[in-house]
């Protein structure tokens, strides 16, 4: 049987290793966790250059940063360009630089394969993706039916991948951002702490695009959305659904922790959690550790930023929007300023606190957004805006 490709999207601290390693316990599946974000950074840069040239935007600064696409008409237009693209784009950057960055990054997530990253090659991005998957295949002792990887921040590239690989399928893993942001803000290495606003916007982007993909011409029936919480609380049911989606027989090894193997450390998977609770199973206690420990002002700030998306996912909110906008307005603005003025290694905002605060509050206070370009600026797409207006939920498992 011909091997097909599988691609996943999630955000950091969302259980990407857990679900990819669990699925890889099934001999029909092999997935790697976050093997090469540089592949997407270089792809984003090249798409930006093409977009700049087509739109004749001389002053547009192109870079490798993974965008959230909120708050700017140009960013919204760039997202539409990426959503209409494919991987048949020539690789024009310095291949040695790309290999070196890929190698350095791989030592953090797939160090068992990192030496192979020094030789990754391809004339187009499609060929680079294929070569990346060939490297991942080296982990498998047989010919799996499904082969691929999951990466963070990159959900906007799913349509391009779908056009280039017509038989590929896609997984989207969602986790409550209050849990992931709490975990990120409390990591030991302070250099890994992200800006809360930027992380929240990437979560919003993930939800808006995931919902639209369920109706997409290129992705309909090729995409499966599940939550980290469902994986932890109902592992057998959740993994069975994924196996059904992939048309492979469920293997109970995927839900037996003793069989979940950490490929890069060459040992049984132990997980990584700021709770410091030892991991020996699909642990419910660790999942909600954040609820007893998160700072109340940070909780309000996150719920303010992700209010509509949390509701759309069915997550229970501790605060209602009206209270956040009135009684807690001052505290939220203080959290905003503290977050935006703090030095971090990664952020995707404009760097202008007043502009960002004004934008986020107007996103909530505008009674109705009518212009398509404004809907995209505030909510990414019309599909999610309709969900917000009608108080509906997206389909997750």
Regions picked out by a protein language model, each given a short descriptive name:
Residues 34-149:
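PAPS-dependent sulfation machinery
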Residues 32-34, 173:
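Generic beta-sheet signal
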Residues 37-40, 178-181, 257-259:
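Short gly/pro/ser/thr-enriched loop/turn and capping motifs at secondary-structure boundaries
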Residues 7, 100-254, 264-279:
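PAPS-dependent sulfotransferase catalytic domain
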Residues 10-11:
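P-loop (Walker A) phosphate-binding loop of NTP-binding proteins
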Residues 1-6, 248-397:
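PAPS-dependent sulfotransferases, especially Golgi type II membrane carbohydrate sulfotransferases
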Residues 17-29:
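A conserved segment at the C-terminal end of the G1
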Residues 26-32, 46-49, 57, 187, ...:
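Phosphate/oxyanion-binding loops and surfaces in catalytic or ligand/nucleic-acid-binding neighborhoods
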């Amino acid at each position: 049987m011909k091997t097909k490709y599988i691609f996943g999207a999630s955000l950091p601290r969302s259980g990407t290793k857990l679900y990819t390693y669990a699925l890889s316990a099934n001999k029909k599946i092999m997935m790697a966790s976050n093997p090469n974000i540089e592949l997407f950074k270089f792809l984003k840069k090249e798409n930006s250059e093409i977009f700049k040239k087509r739109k004749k935007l001389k002053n547009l600064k192109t870079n490798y940063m993974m965008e959230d696409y909120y708050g700017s008409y140009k960013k919204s237009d760039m997202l539409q360009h990426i959503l209409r693209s494919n991987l048949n784009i020539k690789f024009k950057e310095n291949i040695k630089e790309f290999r070196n960055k890929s190698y350095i990054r791989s030592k953090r997530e797939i160090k068992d394969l990192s030496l192979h990253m020094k030789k990754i090659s391809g004339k187009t991005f499609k060929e680079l993706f294929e070569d990346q998957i060939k490297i991942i295949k080296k982990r498998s002792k047989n010919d799996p039916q499904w082969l691929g990887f999951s990466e963070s921040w990159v959900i906007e590239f799913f349509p391009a991948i779908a056009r280039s690989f017509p038989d590929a399928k896609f997984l989207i893993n969602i986790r409550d951002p209050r849990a992931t942001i709490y975990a990120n803000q409390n990591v030991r290495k302070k250099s890994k702490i992200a800006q809360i606003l930027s992380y929240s916007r990437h979560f919003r982007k993930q939800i808006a695009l995931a919902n639209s993909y369920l109706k997409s011409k290129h992705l309909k029936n090729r995409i499966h959305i599940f939550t980290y919480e469902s994986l932890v609380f109902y592992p057998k049911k959740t993994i069975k659904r994924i196996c059904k989606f992939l048309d492979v027989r469920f293997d109970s090894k995927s839900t037996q922790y003793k069989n979940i193997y950490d490929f890069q450390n060459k040992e049984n998977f132990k997980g990584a959690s700021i709770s410091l609770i030892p991991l020996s199973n699909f642990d419910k206690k660790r999942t909600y550790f954040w609820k007893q420990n998160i700072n109340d002002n940070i909780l309000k700030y996150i719920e303010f930023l992700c209010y509509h998306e949390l509701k759309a996912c069915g997550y229970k909110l501790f605060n209602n929007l009206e209270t956040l906008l009135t009684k807690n307005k001052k505290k939220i603005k203080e959290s905003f300023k503290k977050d935006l003025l703090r030095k971090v290694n990664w952020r995707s905002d404009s760097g202008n606190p007043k502009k960002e605060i004004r934008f986020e509050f107007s996103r909530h206070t505008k009674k109705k957004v009518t212009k398509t370009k404004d809907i995209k600026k505030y909510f990414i797409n019309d599909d999610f805006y309709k969900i917000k207006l009608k108080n509906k939920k997206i389909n997750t498992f």
